[in-house]
Each structure stands twice: as C-alpha cells, then as structure tokens.
Amino acid sequence: MHNLTLFLPCPAGVEDFLLAEVQAICPAAAASAQRQRGGVELTGTWDDVLRLNLHSRLAQRVLVRLALQPCPHEDALYQAAHQVLWELWFTPAQTFKVELTAHQCPFQSLNFAALRIKDAVCDRMRERFGQRPSVDTVQPQVRLHAHLGPDQVWLYIDTSGEPLFKRGWRSDTGDAPLKETLAAAMIAASGWTGLDAQGQPQPLYDPCCGSGTVAIEAAQRALQIA
C-alpha cells in the first residue's frame, strides 16, 4: 500500500505524549514516527490515517503532506503550491480553505502568503478543468494546510475535516470550555490509565471539574471508546 507522510499537529508540550499514542495506535509505523515542533510526523498508510483519525485523543488533525519545497520568497511559494497535483485530491465543485502557520518565516504578511497559495490552487484547477473552486472560510469541504519555515514550505491536505477535539458528545459549550484534546493531554501527563499497578480500577478525581471534560475524557479512555 502506498506510503504517505503524515503530520499530526498538537499543542506545544504535548508532542512526547502524542508520539507515544501514535506508536501505540500504529505499531507498524512506530519506527518512522518522530517528534517535531508542534506535532508528530510519521510514514504511514491510508489504514493508519483512518486509525489515527478514529483513535487519537491528542492530535488536533491528521494531515497528509503533499509537498516540501524551498520557499525563499512569495513567488516561490506560488510555484510550490502550483506544482501540487491538487486535481487528484478534490475538484472545482468542492469548496476549500487555506490555513497557514509559520515559524521564523521572513514574509511580511502571512495573509498575503495564504492568498498566494489560494491563487496557485485556483489557477491550477482552472488550467486542468476550465473552472476554479470557491473558497469557503466557514465550512469548507476541503482544508489545505501550509507551514512556512525560514526558507521552506510544507503543504498538506487535511483528512480530518472538523478538528479532532470535537468528539461529538458536547451539545453546549458553556463558559470557557476545556478542549477535549487538552483534557486528554492533562490525563496523559498525570500518568492515569484507569488501572493501578495490580490491574485494579483506579479512580480519577477532578475537584474543579467545570463542565466535566476531564472526567468524560477519562471515562472514554478507560472504556476504550473511540
């Protein structure tokens, strides 16, 4: 099966916990998993993509890398994005959105950089199909991600859709809700697994539970609910 370069972003400080989780979910790809700044990168298959989207409690998304190119200036960014075979991944009938992050990027405007990527995608689609896709910044059907470094750009397509912290059980956000992925990171940092050293059930106490996110996340983990 074709190997893919995957990147799972997470909050700073969670990388080591996410690495251990990824290696447990995808043992066949465990050797390739590497801790990166702000996430974990690995080489995997579409089966791994499905498993990670279903079972990861710490990742924010599961991204497939489509390009890694030199990018010293905005024109190089356009060329890098224009060379990607976007037509293999979606059609002009689908809406899309470009999300961009950066670290030590020399560009003056990240908004302009995102527009250059958008223009490159639309231009390539128009060249291939005679029409261009529309941008939807609220509920896009396809999410593209770019990360800009000092002199390189990483281009990804998102396989998750909605962020993975949206587990599907929360009907009301309440005041200042804790993201489920952050609650999972707190549980991972505590070392709680649901069982003690003798294999007996181990309670978890959250005296400041608020809307109960930590407790619910712990219960789902203990019951192995995806």
Predicted regions and their residues:
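Non-catalytic nucleic-acid substrate-recognition regions in nucleic-acid-modifying enzymes
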Residues: 2-142, 200
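SAM-dependent Rossmann-like transferase core, predominantly class I methyltransferases
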Residues: 155-193
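Generic beta-structure capping elements
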Residues: 45, 101, 149, 156-162
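Short flexible coil/turn linkers enriched for glycine and charged/polar residues
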Residues: 2, 149-151, 212
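Conserved S-adenosyl-L-methionine
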Residues: 178-226
